[in-house]
A protein has these predicted regions:
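Membrane-proximal interfacial segments on either side of biological membranes
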Residues: 1-289, 296-299
């Protein structure tokens, strides 16, 4: 059967969590949706649109099967201000079969990154019926409210609702690099992340306060996962923190430089930090850790 709905929404909030959007109840919006349903093919939305002042959400030809999985979507056109009051503007087009192009001028990835870091290991998406290939092309991407990468390009392959392959790169304003890769072979998944600015990622951990990058600082992460066990290495170079976990803070007071750094509020400085660790289920085991700086060395 066919359906068609055209509504003017007043005095009603609308919340779309996965794109970090909430419509204020005082903002009037036009909502349109039409399509058809059949037992054989599932639910097909010919068009979904939500329009209001400064915000546009349009989806064309979205097909969902009886298991509520996306079979295909021809086009998604989004232009809106999110809950951080940052503008997002991008279009997703299906180019051929299960290949998609995601292209835009602005994307706030802060919400996406935070959710990925908070997600529980092993939690799987349940979105796509088919494996999909996505090409990415963004002019500006916010990593948080203050840090932006430019010319983000790359490719992402999703297989069995998991990120199977990825090769993504971008640059900061100073021309330094940001890269992210995933390579899966013989049931082993290797993930790498390199950022010439560590702050946009490290600042998300509440127990670390006042983190600042040095001019030559960077973050380098490598992880190999197989049979539910991951072996990882994290390196952060040239940084300082104003508040650090209790053990490191006590150790830093063993040197005159550490006392001076903490009392003056300058923070404890490190030239090198490296940690090797494994994850299995909910258990993380730190195999080796060292941090070196003028005020403190931890081995």
């Amino acid at each position: 059967y066919n359906f068609k709905t055209n509504l003017e929404i007043k005095d009603t909030p609308i919340k779309i969590d996965f794109i970090n959007y909430k419509k204020d109840k005082n903002l009037n919006s036009q909502f349109k949706i039409y399509g058809n349903y059949s037992k054989k093919f599932g639910l097909e939305f010919k068009k979904i649109s939500l329009l209001s002042k400064n915000n546009k959400f349009i989806i064309n030809n979205l097909l969902i099967d009886k298991n509520n999985k996306i079979v295909k979507v021809d086009k998604i056109d989004l232009d809106y201000f999110d809950n951080d009051n940052l503008k997002n503007k991008f279009i997703a087009n299906r180019t051929k079969n299960n290949n998609y192009e995601l292209k835009g001028s602005l994307l706030n990835a802060d919400f996406i990154i935070s959710n990925l870091l908070k997600s529980k290991d092993g939690k799987q998406l349940d979105i796509f019926k088919n494996n999909v290939n996505i090409t990415l092309d963004f002019s500006d991407v916010y990593l948080d409210n203050y840090n932006v990468v430019k010319n983000l390009n790359g490719k992402l392959r999703i297989k069995d609702d998991k990120a199977y392959q990825a090769n993504i790169s971008a640059t900061f304003d100073n021309g330094k690099k940001f890269t992210f890769t995933i390579n899966t072979k013989d049931d082993e998944k290797i993930t790498t992340l390199f950022s010439s600015k560590a702050k946009p990622l490290v600042n998300r951990y509440e127990f670390i306060k006042g983190f600042e990058d040095g001019d030559e600082g960077y973050l380098d992460f490598y992880s190999s996962k197989k049979d539910g066990i991951s072996n990882s290495k994290l390196i952060i170079d040239n940084f300082k923190v104003k508040e650090i976990p209790a053990l490191a803070k006590v150790l830093s007071l063993a040197s005159l430089q550490g006392i001076a750094d903490l009392l003056t509020g300058e923070g404890v400085r490190f030239t090198d930090f490296e940690m090797n660790f494994t994850n299995k289920g909910k258990l993380m085991t730190i195999e080796e850790l060292y941090a070196i700086g003028p005020a403190i060395s931890i081995l």
